[in-house]
């Protein structure tokens, strides 16, 4: 039973890692920080997979990119940690963890729960990404940039769109959550029948 449940979880983790990779290539080029749809799948991973599995889906995505597969917006490889935007990827993993943890704590999450969780996840992403962007530009890339410039390109340019995506993802998650919960329930019934 445990083995079959973990197999289902692994499939979901792999699926959301792949979806996050796909989201990296649906982008609008902007200075330093391109706008992508990755964040949608981060929100959905947290909302639908829960804290642990949502977090793991983003770790898998990051791991695949760091070993060399070009799944990030600007390629892949271990040196990608030096990219100014790598902080967003760290933020993605932490956001999925916190979003999932918040949803996991509610027995029957509502639209409000998903929206609040996603907004908090969005805050976490930017809280990690903007300082990382500043340090990357000023320390190891030696591209002297003021906090105001970093705040503009790393936050102001994309926060409105990301906020809208957080709300839209929450509304979608509310509907999909019931489907995911039903699928898990059906799977458990099948497993119980097999064990009878």
Curated annotation (Swiss-Prot):
The chain crosses the membrane at residues 8-28, 30-50, 59-79, 81-101, 114-134, 150-170. Pfam families: BioY. It is found in: Cell membrane. One of its GO terms (cellular component) is plasma membrane. The keyword Transport applies. It comes from the Bacteria. Keywords: Cell membrane, Membrane, Transmembrane, Transmembrane helix, Transport. It is a multi-pass membrane protein. GO terms for molecular function: biotin transmembrane transporter activity. Gene3D superfamilies: 1.10.1760.20. Its main location: membrane. The keyword Transmembrane helix applies. Probable biotin transporter. Belongs to the BioY family. This is Probable biotin transporter BioY. The gene is bioY.
């Amino acid at each position: 039973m445990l083995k079959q449940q973990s197999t289902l979880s692994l499939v979901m983790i792999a699926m959301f890692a792949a979806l996050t990779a796909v989201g990296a290539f649906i982008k609008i080029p902007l200075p330093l920080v391109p706008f992508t749809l990755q964040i949608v799948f981060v929100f959905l991973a947290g909302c639908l997979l829960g804290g642990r599995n949502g977090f793991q889906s983003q770790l898998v995505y990051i791991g695949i990119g760091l070993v060399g597969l070009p799944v990030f917006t600007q390629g892949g490889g271990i040196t990608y940690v030096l990219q100014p935007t790598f902080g967003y990827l760290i933020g993605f993993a932490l956001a999925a963890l916190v979003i999932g943890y918040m949803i996991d704590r509610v027995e029957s999450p509502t639209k409000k729960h998903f929206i609040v969780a996603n907004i908090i996840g969005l805050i976490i992403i930017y809280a990690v990404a903007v300082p990382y962007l500043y340090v990357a530009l000023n320390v190891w890339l030696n591209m002297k940039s003021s906090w105001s410039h970093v705040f503009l390109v790393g936050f102001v340019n994309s926060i409105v769109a990301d906020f809208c995506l957080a709300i839209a993802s929450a509304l979608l998650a509310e509907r999909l959550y019931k489907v995911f919960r039903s699928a898990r329930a059906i799977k458990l019934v099948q497993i119980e029948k097999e064990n009878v």
